[in-house]
């Protein structure tokens, strides 16, 4: 693929560079700085609001939905330039922009679009993905979490796992089984769920690093109003495909290894800095190569759409 900018793309890149130079530094995280979860979320929301005010939130989202109405290549350009700064961009923001908004925009009602889209673009709402289960990961259609209709609500029981940042999310996108008597792909229904709903128990999973980015999420008699169903009954698989397309296109994170290299270069060691250590250099070089491969794959996927 051709990585050279067209005349129009070069002009957009120059515009983005100038805007980022004026607005990104005050939001940037210093190399080696460790933030609490609460600070990460607060700063991530503030940076998202800055982008919204500047017209860079939801670059590919149609203007009718409050986005910029730009091209996928413009989104790639912005990501590349934004990646030059160490900014607070966690999954609690990315899931909303890259997964929740596409499915709500494509399958949601006008009322759902009005309720969720602008607030998410502004960084006022954070999101998690409630898909994977202990016995349904790669085989997503095998989910067992059940939803049964009761009046104007659906009552949900089940368990989800590996829910990134669910413990700090306002809303979740949820796929459940509503009809166990049909082919598994056809018995699914899609909801958005308020993570503060009674019956939701989010349990952080402690990682070896000490952080807790992932969670187990238990749903016990959780009542979800039918107005929070996305699409119709049995249309959950189509909604999932919309979400997963957005997820695949959002893979790759620019600038993380460069930031780590800068930190290593500034961190003293027994002789020189950490970056002078051959084993550190090798580890960073390996990580950089993997990051670049992932970024090139992302660019290829985006330009194939």
Where are the model-predicted features located?
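A short, Trp-centered hydrophobic/proline-enriched beta-strand micro-motif
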Residues: 123-131, 175
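Buried hydrophobic positions in well-ordered alpha/beta secondary-structure cores of metabolic enzymes
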Residues: 9, 20, 55, 62, ...
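A short core secondary-structure module
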Residues: 144, 152-153, 157-203
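Short Ser/Thr-interspersed hydrophobic loop/turn segments at strand-loop and sheet-helix junctions
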Residues: 55, 78-83, 175-176, 192-197, ...
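N-terminal glycine-rich flavin-associated loop
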Residues: 91-111, 137
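Short Gly/Pro-enriched turn/cap motifs at secondary-structure boundaries
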Residues: 93, 135-138, 162-165, 180-182, ...
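Amphipathic, small/basic residue-rich leader segments at the start of a protein or domain
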Residues: 1-94, 115, 119-122, 250, ...
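Glycine-rich beta->alpha junctions and the first turn(s) of the following alpha-helix
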Residues: 3, 200-297, 304
